[in-house]
């Protein structure tokens, strides 16, 4: 129902005129009766005070009478065109109060969850649920009292109150804490407008406290756009804003999607993804743990160390307790973990990942290294999106404030020592060969290519994306010690802290036949 109100906008530059008063227009009138009653005086500059008739004729200026008449006419015209604002009582509010809250002239009663609502069929027909009920051959179409069965445990009395009330008013205020219950009621009653409003409320209020509940509810009630938005939030925040509370709530199925995605906003390197998974698995197994994020890794390592002593010779993911988590760990890109010596040692010592998984990846990387050294491998020459999505190196960096930064990500990258610089709003890639020290071997080939994608993002306090830039997948060919600007940032879009995430592919994918493809192998 639309609220009735009258609102007319004034022309620009025009102010509301005051009500006309006696003597307006510049003529001064005496308030006392006497010989001057009905007359006025002229106070023209340089002239004597002269008595004037009620016609306000000025002998100093014979044309003044005509001017005054014209001014008075203009004034009246202005008054006629000056809007007057008068707020009318809202029809919508009247209907909501009188018909819904007071139940006046009700022709049907709806009973549910021990509560009763005195409503009106003509309003209920806005609901697809009741429209079908009243227009068909259902026995309820002729009943004055209808008992509703509520099979959905998310629906409560308050949610039904909001859902029924939405039929009698234009706008509904929805609290984020109540949106799931209201959505459930709206879906049951087939209230499309309310369902849409619930969806918008959910998308606007995604946070660490709401994201998992919203994701589950969006899947239950078919809000694909909300589900997609929640997944995007998780991809952006899982690693950048780690949370004990979030780790506890994330299900195995959701975590599998996140870890398998090339859009996961990784901070540092793939080893940090493994560490996050280890902490998440501990909290899934010990949900009663209530320490801080700083304490979490230490407690996690202690817990798994105790387990390791009891199950010597068996990796955790091979046990009955660990098997449910194996599908998530399979999505780790282990080739970028074992390429760093310190990380390789940790993953061996933890005894979480089956040795067969690691053996397959060691073999794969050894053969790739031989190709790079002996087969004139110069890197990817074309965009292979499938390979980039599934096997690219994921890494990132947080820039706390504006300034100059230069860094490299650790690990063996087939002789391509990539230096990344941020300075003066530019991001620069440099292929280092001889100019700067490098801990590993460096390829001296004249040219080397890499496939990459660069993404930048800033987030507000709730983890919502407030600005972002991305390059898309590209091929970059660099000569020895050559550097290249890969992104120039608009200072207006720079909001710190700034998060940088990259995907890299340093060598072209090996041509594999169907016979040697192994989907269960995490290295492929």
Swiss-Prot record:
Protein's name according to its UniProt entry: Germ cell-less protein-like 1
Record motif Nuclear localization signal, residues: 47-53, 83-89
Residue positions, PTM Phosphoserine: 64
Domain BTB: 106-176
GO CC terms: nuclear envelope; nuclear matrix
Function: Possible function in spermatogenesis. Enhances the degradation of MDM2 and increases the amount of p53 probably by modulating the nucleocytoplasmic transport.
Record field: compositional bias (Acidic residues): 65-74
Pfam family name, one: BTB
Region entry Disordered, spans: 1-37, 63-83
Keyword field contains Calcium: no
Alphabetized InterPro entries for the sequence: BACK (IPR011705), BTB/POZ_dom (IPR000210), Gcl-like (IPR043380), SKP1/BTB/POZ_sf (IPR011333)
Family matches, as SUPFAM superfamilies: POZ domain
A GO BP annotation: spermatogenesis
Subcellular location: Nucleus matrix
Free-text tissue specificity from the UniProt record: Ubiquitously expressed at low levels throughout development and in adult tissues.
Lineage per the UniProt record: Eukaryota, Metazoa, Chordata, Craniata, Vertebrata
Transmembrane segments: none
Modified residues (Phosphothreonine): 66
SMART domains (UniProt xref): BACK, BTB
Assembly with partners or alone: Interacts with TMPO-Beta, TSG101 and TFDP2. Interacts with EMD.
Keywords of the record: Developmental protein, Differentiation, Nucleus, Phosphoprotein, Spermatogenesis
């Amino acid at each position: 129902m639309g609220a009735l109100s009258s609102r007319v906008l004034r022309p620009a530059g025009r102010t509301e005129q005051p009500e006309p008063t006696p003597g307006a227009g510049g003529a001064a009138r005496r308030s006392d009766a006497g010989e001057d009653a009905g007359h006025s005086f002229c106070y023209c500059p340089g002239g004597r005070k002269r008595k004037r008739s009620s016609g306000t004729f000025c002998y100093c200026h014979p044309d003044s009478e005509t001017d005054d008449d014209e001014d008075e006419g203009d004034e009246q015209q202005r008054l006629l065109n000056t809007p007057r604002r008068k707020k009318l009582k809202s029809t919508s509010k009247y209907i909501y109060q009188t018909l819904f809250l007071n139940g006046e002239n009700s022709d049907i009663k709806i009973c549910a969850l021990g509560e009763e609502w005195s409503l009106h069929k003509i309003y209920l027909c806005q609901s697809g649920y009741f429209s079908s009920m009243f227009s068909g051959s259902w026995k309820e179409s002729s009943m004055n009292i209808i008992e509703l069965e509520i099979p959905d445990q998310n629906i409560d009395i308050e949610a039904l109150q909001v859902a029924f009330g939405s039929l009698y008013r234009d706008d509904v205020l929805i609290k984020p804490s109540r949106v799931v219950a209201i959505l459930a009621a709206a879906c049951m009653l087939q209230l499309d407008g309310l369902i849409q409003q619930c969806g918008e409320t959910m998308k606007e209020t995604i946070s660490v406290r709401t994201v998992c509940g919203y994701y589950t509810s969006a899947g239950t009630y078919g809000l694909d756009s909300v589900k997609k938005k929640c997944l995007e939030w998780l991809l952006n925040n899982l690693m950048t804003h780690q949370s004990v509370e979030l780790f506890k709530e994330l299900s195995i199925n959701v975590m599998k999607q996140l870890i398998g995605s090339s859009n996961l906003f990784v901070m540092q390197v793939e080893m940090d993804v493994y560490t996050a998974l280890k902490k998440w698995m501990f909290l899934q197994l010990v949900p009663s743990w209530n320490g801080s994020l700083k304490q979490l890794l230490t407690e996690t390592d202690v817990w798994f160390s105790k387990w390791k002593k009891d199950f010597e010779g068996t990796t955790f993911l091979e046990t009955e307790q660990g098997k449910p988590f194996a599908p998530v760990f399979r999505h780790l890109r282990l080739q970028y973990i074992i390429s760093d010596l310190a990380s390789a040692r940790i993953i061996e010592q933890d005894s979480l990942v089956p040795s067969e998984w690691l053996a397959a990846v060691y073999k794969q990387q050894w053969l790739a290294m031989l190709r790079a050294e002996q087969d004139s491998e110069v890197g990817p020459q074309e965009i292979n999106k499938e390979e980039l999505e599934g096997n690219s190196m994921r890494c990132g960096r947080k820039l706390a404030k504006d300034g100059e930064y230069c860094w490299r990500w650790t690990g063996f990258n087939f002789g391509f020592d990539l230096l990344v610089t941020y300075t003066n709003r530019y991001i620069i890639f440099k292929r280092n060969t001889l100019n700067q020290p490098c801990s590993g071997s460096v390829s001296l080939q004249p040219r080397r290519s890499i496939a990459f994608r660069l993404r930048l993002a800033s987030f507000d306090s709730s983890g919502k994306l407030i600005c972002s830039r991305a390059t898309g997948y590209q091929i970059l060919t660099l000569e020895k010690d050559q550097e290249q600007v890969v992104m120039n940032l608009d200072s207006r879009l720079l909001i710190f802290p700034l998060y940088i995430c990259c995907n890299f592919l340093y060598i072209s994918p090996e041509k594999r036949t169907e016979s040697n493809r192994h989907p269960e192998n995490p290295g492929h």
